């Protein structure tokens, strides 16, 4: 058996049918750069990574090139066995044990680093790391060469990879296009409702009535209330469903309070279950793979529907935040069916409330190409817009601020990124809208405070949303500094200072007012 296509029936048998990775055309053996050779070595069929305590700035990798030039509408699946000792957990993104793929997205020029879930700290015995990466209709950029990566990123510990266990294949899409022709119908009040425009509120129960009053004065009429914070809490301690239930109750109490403030001002709320049992909807979570967590997710929405039934300020129930399912789930627990189950549970209690349904790939526009419409009325479909990510997220989420002269601008003529390119990226969403008579809600979009041209990017995004008739909420209001439109960077100190006289703030407030 070779390591190219396996028939779909083989998938039921699982990874045991993976063929060993052979030398690929245009590929090479595992290589170790000179800069990390003192931490990484190969002994027979073992890759040893040993980074001593106190060393935390090293990417101790072995890499292997792979030709992905003809990989379209398919998936890469890979696995390897690994064991470790004294691994130190670093809570910052992307640190830790690595089985990953490094490649460049040819659509936007962004570098991608998808990685397998892996033990985060301490000692662990032989563990099977599994990586799955989906590719769309456009081939991966050929340069720089895509690389498979094994190792330890920016933390210390000792790892042993069994290279003889490394398996790899090119597989069919996890979610082949299975669209239907269902035409969504909406109640008269929803169909005739004016445009809803607003922001994602503060996380971790930190919204205030003054926040809502200020948003009302700015012209907003919608707030996405994120019930979040549990994923970061889980990283700090071993968590249980009891912990999650207590967290949910605190968030629902806060949501009731915020909803009252909104209703008093004739504004509405998107209720967003940002953290499911017990963590996230992608690499950081198990809701698709642990039956108890999946069932609790559905039950939680049943409880929420009972609690908020009849509240006039509910715009809709936002079932999932940014599902990123890349491997097979339990039966009826994949991102689509789990949302279906939750929607059915809600409708059994409240037949009138609006459901907000999430696309895969972190609500990405591309995922609308294979998203099937739920055969249920009064469902709004949600997209998030952060393309190109190399522009929107430069300096965000703990990443260092780009050095002067290295920032990515918008528009970006060198990469062909402008308003029409944004339209191209959003095309699958617009096509889904037309095909199903579906309402679309942009739950998140943004550009970092450090991004040159961020204000123009927001204006162009909002212009497209308005053209298509989509409701939207900006990410986010008075939360992380890199998204806060009420601040600017003091170039003398490099620190944020309050100042509303900036392009991002004006773009957003003009958008609220339909300008």
Predicted feature locations:
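Extracellular and organelle-lumenal recognition/adhesion modules and their flexible linkers in secreted
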Residues: 21-183
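N-terminal carbohydrate-binding accessory modules
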Residues: 171-245, 432
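Bacterial N-terminal signal peptides
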Residues: 8-20
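Active-site region of glycoside hydrolase catalytic domains
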Residues: 295-416, 423-447, 467-470
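Surface-exposed, active-site-proximal loop segments in enzymatic domains
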Residues: 231-251, 277-293, 325-327, 484-492
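Aromatic-lined substrate-binding rim segments of carbohydrate-active enzymes
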Residues: 210-278, 338-350, 457-465
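Acidic-and-aromatic substrate-binding clefts and catalytic sites of carbohydrate-active enzymes
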Residues: 201-210, 230-233, 246-249, 295, ...
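Aromatic-rich peripheral "rim/lid" segments of glycoside hydrolase catalytic domains that contact
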Residues: 176-179, 452-515
């Amino acid at each position: 058996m070779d390591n190219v296509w396996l028939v779909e029936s083989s998938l039921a048998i699982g990874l045991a049918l993976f063929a060993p990775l052979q030398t690929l055309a245009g590929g090479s053996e595992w290589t170790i750069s000179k800069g990390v050779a003192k931490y990484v070595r190969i002994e027979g069929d073992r890759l040893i990574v040993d980074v001593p305590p106190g060393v935390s700035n090293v990417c101790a990798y072995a890499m292997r090139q792979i030709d992905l030039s003809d990989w379209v509408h398919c998936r890469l699946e890979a696995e390897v066995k690994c064991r470790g000792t004294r691994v130190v957990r670093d809570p910052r993104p992307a640190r830790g044990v690595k089985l990953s793929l490094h490649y460049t997205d040819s659509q936007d020029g962004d570098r991608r680093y998808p990685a397998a879930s892996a033990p985060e700290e301490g000692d662990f015995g032989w563990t099977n790391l599994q990586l799955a990466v989906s590719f769309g209709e456009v081939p991966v950029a050929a340069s720089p060469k895509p690389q498979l990566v094994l190792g330890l990123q920016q933390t210390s510990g000792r790892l042993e990879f069994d290279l003889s266990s490394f398996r790899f294949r090119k597989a069919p899409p996890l979610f082949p296009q299975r669209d239907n022709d269902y035409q969504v119908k909406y109640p008269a009040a929803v169909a005739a409702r004016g445009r809803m425009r607003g922001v994602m509120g503060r996380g971790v129960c930190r919204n205030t009535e003054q926040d809502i009053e200020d948003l009302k004065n700015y012209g907003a009429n919608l707030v996405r209330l994120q019930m979040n914070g549990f994923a970061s809490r889980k990283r700090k301690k071993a968590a249980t469903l009891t912990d999650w239930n207590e967290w949910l109750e605190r968030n629902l109490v806060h949501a009731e309070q915020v909803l009252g403030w909104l209703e008093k001002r004739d504004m509405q709320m998107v209720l967003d279950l940002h953290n499911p049992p017990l963590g996230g909807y992608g690499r950081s979570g198990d809701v698709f793979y642990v039956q108890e967590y999946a069932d609790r997710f559905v039950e939680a929405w049943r409880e929420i529907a009972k609690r908020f039934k009849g509240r006039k300020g509910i715009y809709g129930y936002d079932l999932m935040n940014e599902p990123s399912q890349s491997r097979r789930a339990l039966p009826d627990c994949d991102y689509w069916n789990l949302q279906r189950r939750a929607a059915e549970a809600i409708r059994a209690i409240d037949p009138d409330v609006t459901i907000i349904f999430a696309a895969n790939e972190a609500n990405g526009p591309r995922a609308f190409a294979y998203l099937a419409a739920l055969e249920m009325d009064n469902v709004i479909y949600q997209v998030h817009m952060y393309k190109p990510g190399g522009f929107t997220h430069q300096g965000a989420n703990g990443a260092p601020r780009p050095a002067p002269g290295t920032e990515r601008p918008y528009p970006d003529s060198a990469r062909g990124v402008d308003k029409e390119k944004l339209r191209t990226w959003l095309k699958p969403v617009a096509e889904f809208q037309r095909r199903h008579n579906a309402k679309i809600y942009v739950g998140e979009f943004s550009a970092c405070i450090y991004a040159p041209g961020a204000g123009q990017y927001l204006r162009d995004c909002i212009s497209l949303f308005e053209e298509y008739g989509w409701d939207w909420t900006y990410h986010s209001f008075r939360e992380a500094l890199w998204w806060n439109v009420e601040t600017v960077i003091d170039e003398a100190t490099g620190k944020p200072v309050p100042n509303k006289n900036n392009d991002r703030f004006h773009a957003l407030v003009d958008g609220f007012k339909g300008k």
